[in-house]
Amino acid sequence: MLGSIACSMEFEDFDLYSYFYGLVKQIPEGYVTTYGDLAQALGDPIAARAVGYMLSINEDPDTIPCYRVVLHDGTVGNYTHPLGPMEKVRRLRADGIPVVDGMIENFDRYRFRDFKTDQPLRKMQQYQEYIARKYSESGAGEFRTVAAFDVSYEERRAFASMVIQDGSTIEAYVISDGINFPYIPGYLAFREFRFIKKLYRKADLLLIDGNGILHPRFAGLATHAGVLLDRASIGVAKHLTRSTRHQDIIYMQDRPVGVMIRKNMIVSPGNFIDVNGSADTVRKMWNDRYPWPLKLAHQLSTRHAETGGRVSEYSIESAHELH
DNA sequence: GCGACAG
DNA sequence: ATCTTGTCGC
Ligand SMILES: [Mg+2]
């Protein structure tokens, strides 16, 4: 029964930006809060930097009072404005907050933390635990068709690509759509999975830029996608995080979850494959020490982001050249 | 003070 | 990821 509840809430359309700006509006005039307190109200203190980022791209500073968000040590912090933090100080003083030398006097007295929130990131963590339970390490081991995915970004727009190899045939697809979730460490799947789902065509293996079970809750983007699309999947990341390494094997809480197959290339199983199988599979499909479908997907999405998505036909021919 | 924080 | 308003632990 709990499983069926989880199935009905994949969070793909959840707009964290709107939810977040709603929280910022709760800060009363004459009070301040911190980036960390807002992150806690979202459900996880690790989101503090994402809070700063979302404030920085706020398009409506007249109704969303960014300037009431300050650093944990009582200094006012940054502000995107021609006048910079000076303008932040001016607005705080206009609210009656005493600021001396960029520091709020009697900080505790003015601090607001009583947000009305249901901490959405907590429910998302629970959903990740459900995804992790669905991971299976056994599968076919041989894959005829491979689909590789990557996503590039502007502030509120994403350009996502998929490159499919079926024997000697290569097809490439690009889509563009708005973004409803910022990058938050540990929550990448809630930002990127919906683009992968939209692009997805039947393939035996999904190759994904990010981690699989190499994740604090064993449910990185590649596992999230593999489980929800019921496909074999592998995560390929450039940076190692939140784990320990002995030789080239990566561990999380003493469980092997990935392999460093070279500097700046970490492979972890997403679904229907194990740690060694995922590393062997990626090693078989690289060209110049990089799995070529992923490289192509990366180039496709970045190129489309740079040109604003205008028809810059980066075509099948160049795909063949790279292969 | 410096590094960690998947993209 | 892009070029950017954090926080915590060592
Ligand atoms: Mg990427």
From Swiss-Prot:
GO terms for molecular function: deoxyribonuclease V activity; metal ion binding; methyltransferase activity; RNA endonuclease activity, producing 5'-phosphomonoesters; single-stranded RNA binding. GO terms for biological process: DNA repair; methylation. Mg(2+) binds at residues 150, 209. Keywords: Cytoplasm, DNA damage, DNA repair, Endonuclease, Hydrolase, Magnesium, Metal-binding, Methyltransferase, Multifunctional enzyme, Nuclease, Transferase. Residues 92-323 are annotated as: Endonuclease V. Pfam families: DNA_binding_1, Endonuclease_5. Its cofactor is Mg(2+). The active site is at 66. It catalyses: Endonucleolytic cleavage at apurinic or apyrimidinic sites to products with a 5'-phosphate. Residues 1-91 are annotated as: Probable methylated-DNA--protein-cysteine methyltransferase. Transmembrane segments: none annotated. One of its GO terms (cellular component) is cytoplasm. InterPro entries: Endonuclease-V (IPR007581), MethylDNA_cys_MeTrfase_DNA-bd (IPR014048), MethylDNA_cys_MeTrfase_DNAb (IPR036217), WH-like_DNA-bd_sf (IPR036388). It is found in: Cytoplasm. The record marks 183 as: Interaction with target DNA. Its EC number is 2.1.1.-, 3.1.21.7. The keyword Nuclease applies. PANTHER family: ENDONUCLEASE V. DNA repair enzyme involved in the repair of deaminated bases. Selectively cleaves double-stranded DNA at the second phosphodiester bond 3' to a deoxyinosine leaving behind the intact lesion on the nicked DNA. In the N-terminal section; belongs to the MGMT family. In the C-terminal section; belongs to the endonuclease V family. This is Bifunctional methyltransferase/endonuclease. The lineage of its organism: Archaea, Methanobacteriati, Thermoplasmatota, Thermoplasmata, Thermoplasmatales.
